[in-house]
């Protein structure tokens, strides 16, 4: 990067990496090695003191291996394939300062993605334009509003396991939002009200309101609470995909998943409470509690043996017959033990309760699909001679229904900064076990396990 003149700066970059195979539980290679190369640029130009123009773009290409089993229970049906992905994007953004309390931003974006693998082939083009305007209304209100439009065009191909009712779609998304931050008591009591509005081609008009309040009685304490609604609108795969993934062990027939052209929006209402306190100059603590209520979640409904279409198969349809609740809390703390030694710790607890509709036949969604307890501890030291020594510990509870046991991970880093331009470091990751699983196999894709590793890094800044 560098400076073209007093008003124009630029940056270019290039990256390339390669990763070798993961391993299966028996220690054999998983044929999921991958590599990626990418490059890009960014230019920032200030033609006037009130204007900033940004142009940036990226291109990339990658190849990622995967191991499949046509029948997950039969090793003889195992085969390997690679995901070939490439694409690029371009972004242009203009920011105009209208006055000391008002700013206008207009941004446009284009993205092209090509993905090609054994089971899925897609080319996707996305064009997006949006406008944001921030201004003050009196001394109490700070208002931000905006409008947006997105056009997505894709082409998909039928494969041996995935077929589509539509081999290409042009989908439009119109959006807008408004938010008002109200200083009820300046610097003490803030109320933020807002909503996002969208219109999509699948489910029509969607509203996502939110409200947040924060109270700062002293410079060392803040209480806050929030309530919001969010949605996930259908994807093409929810509505018009047919996916053959397995063989039913009882009937001996293929399992075929069908999209549902009546699949509707999934929604969640989120309730949050929080407290932040700094009891001493060296200690900071945060507590956040949450309760989420989900409705119309995607379910996979077993319709039994079907001959439409032939040959005979077990028909499974996508529907909206699940509800759920998640609740829990997260406690985080930071302790500056010495000017050169810092500790950070986090504990999170989450509980998931599934509530299927009375007519649902989905038995695959389980309450053990999330880790109930997660603990993280991190130490960072700035040592004499420009050395740095960092250690991290992470515990993740078991995913019972996915047959993933709990695991404990330790990472260590030793770094040296002889001057501001150079950094040399060596890092060890997952040092306690030679390997461990962190996720389950997904349909026919076979999981590999995370291995311990050591790598070195050299960074030069100029």
Predicted regions and their residues:
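Surface-exposed extracellular loop regions of Gram-negative outer-membrane beta-barrel proteins
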Residues: 5-24, 36, 70-72, 101-117, 168-203, 215, 220-270, ...
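Outer-membrane beta-barrel transmembrane domain signature of Gram-negative proteins
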Residues: 71-72, 79-91, 96, 110, ...
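Membrane-embedded beta-barrel scaffold of Gram-negative outer-membrane proteins
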Residues: 8, 101-109, 113-116, 216, ...
């Amino acid at each position: 990067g560098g400076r073209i003149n007093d008003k124009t700066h630029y940056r270019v970059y290039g990256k390339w990496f390669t990763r070798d195979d993961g391993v299966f539980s028996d220690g054999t290679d998983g044929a999921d090695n991958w590599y990626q190369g990418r490059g890009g640029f960014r230019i920032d130009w200030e033609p006037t003191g009130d204007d900033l123009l940004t142009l940036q773009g990226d291109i990339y290409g990658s190849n990622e291996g995967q191991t499949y089993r046509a029948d997950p229970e039969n090793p003889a049906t195992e085969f390997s394939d690679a995901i070939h992905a490439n694409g690029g994007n371009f972004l242009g953004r203009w920011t105009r300062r209208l006055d000391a309390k008002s700013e206008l931003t207009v941004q446009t974006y284009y993205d092209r993605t090509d993905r090609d693998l054994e089971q899925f082939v897609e080319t996707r083009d996305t064009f997006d334009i949006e406008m944001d305007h921030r201004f003050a209304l009196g001394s109490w209100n700070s208002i931000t509003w905006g409008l947006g439009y997105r056009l997505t065009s894709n082409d998909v191909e039928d494969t041996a396991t995935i077929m589509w009712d539509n081999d290409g779609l042009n989908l439009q998304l119109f959006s807008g939002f408004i938010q008002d931050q109200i200083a009820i008591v300046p610097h003490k009591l803030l109320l933020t009200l807002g909503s996002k509005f969208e219109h999509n081609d699948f489910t029509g008009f969607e509203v996502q309101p939110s409200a947040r309040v924060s109270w700062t009685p002293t410079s060392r304490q803040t209480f806050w609470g929030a309530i919001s609604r969010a949605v996930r609108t259908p994807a093409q795969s929810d509505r018009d995909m047919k996916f053959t993934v397995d063989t039913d062990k009882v009937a001996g027939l293929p399992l075929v998943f069908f999209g549902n052209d009546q699949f509707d929006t999934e929604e969640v209402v989120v309730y949050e409470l929080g407290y932040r306190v700094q009891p001493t100059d060296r200690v900071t603590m945060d507590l956040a509690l949450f309760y989420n209520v989900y409705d119309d979640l995607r379910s996979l409904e077993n319709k039994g043996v079907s001959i439409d279409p032939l040959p005979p198969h077990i028909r499974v349809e996508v529907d909206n017959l699940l509800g759920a609740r998640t609740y829990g809390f997260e406690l985080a703390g930071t302790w500056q033990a010495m000017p050169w030694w810092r500790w950070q710790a986090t504990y999170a607890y989450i509980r998931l309760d599934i509530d299927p509709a009375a007519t649902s036949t989905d038995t695959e969604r389980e309450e053990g699909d999330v880790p109930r307890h997660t603990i993280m501890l991190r130490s960072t030291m700035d040592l004499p001679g420009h050395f740095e020594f960092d250690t991290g510990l992470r515990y993740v509870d078991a995913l019972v229904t996915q047959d993933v046991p709990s695991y404990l991970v330790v990472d260590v880093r030793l770094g040296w900064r002889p001057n501001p331009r150079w950094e040399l470091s060596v890092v060890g990751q997952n040092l306690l076990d030679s390997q461990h699983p962190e996720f389950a196999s997904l349909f026919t894709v076979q999981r590999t396990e995370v291995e311990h590793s050591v790598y070195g890094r050299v960074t030069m800044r100029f």
